[in-house]
């Protein structure tokens, strides 16, 4: 416990909170060729690698992921949600924040139904999260 004198001399230092999705907090000015501290809710990027990885214990699956080079020059690993996807190398995708708990190092999600990413086929519920259009009434 500090004394009053110690508090007067030093004061309390507030903790710095680290971002959970740091790649979204950096921008890039291509004219000046310099990084800027402009945050954005989503970012566009190009897939450099698409593959599957296995989750941590106790889960077992083949989770789909893509390595994405963003417009600010940072390369991140992003999860591809939903069943089936049409992504391959050089696909242009939109990423948002949000980690995948059982995949270490995956801090971003790819937005389905935006840019080159198709929505999930034959999805009836939770369609807005997977970029699926409303089915035609018969």
Swiss-Prot record:
Gene3D superfamilies referenced in this protein's UniProt entry, alphabetically: Nucleic acid-binding proteins
SUPFAM superfamilies with a match to the protein in the record: Nucleic acid-binding proteins (SSF50249)
Site (Not modified): 102
GO CC, one annotated term: small ribosomal subunit
Alphabetized Pfam families for the sequence: Ribosom_S12_S23 (PF00164)
CDD domains: Ribosomal_S12 (cd03368)
Region (Disordered): 33-55
Keywords for the protein's UniProt record, in alphabetical order: Antibiotic resistance, Ribonucleoprotein, Ribosomal protein, RNA-binding, rRNA-binding, tRNA-binding
UniProt-recorded Gene Ontology molecular function terms: rRNA binding; structural constituent of ribosome; tRNA binding
Glycoprotein found in the keyword field: no
InterPro entries per the UniProt record, alphabetical: NA-bd_OB-fold, Ribosomal_uS12, Ribosomal_uS12_bac
GO biological process: response to antibiotic; translation
Known role: With S4 and S5 plays an important role in translational accuracy. Interacts with and stabilizes bases of the 16S rRNA that are involved in tRNA selection in the A site and with the mRNA backbone. Located at the interface of the 30S and 50S subunits, it traverses the body of the 30S subunit contacting proteins on the other side and probably holding the rRNA structure together. The combined cluster of proteins S8, S12 and S17 appears to hold together the shoulder and platform of the 30S subunit.
Misc. remarks from the entry: Many streptomycin resistant B.subtilis with mutations in this protein produce increased quantities of a natural (but uncharacterized) antibiotic.
HAMAP family: Ribosomal_uS12_B
Family membership: Belongs to the universal ribosomal protein uS12 family.
Subunit details: Part of the 30S ribosomal subunit. Contacts proteins S8 and S17. May interact with IF1 in the 30S initiation complex. Interacts with BrxC.
Protein name: Small ribosomal subunit protein uS12
Lineage: Bacteria, Bacillati, Bacillota, Bacilli, Bacillales
Gene that this sequence comes from: rpsL
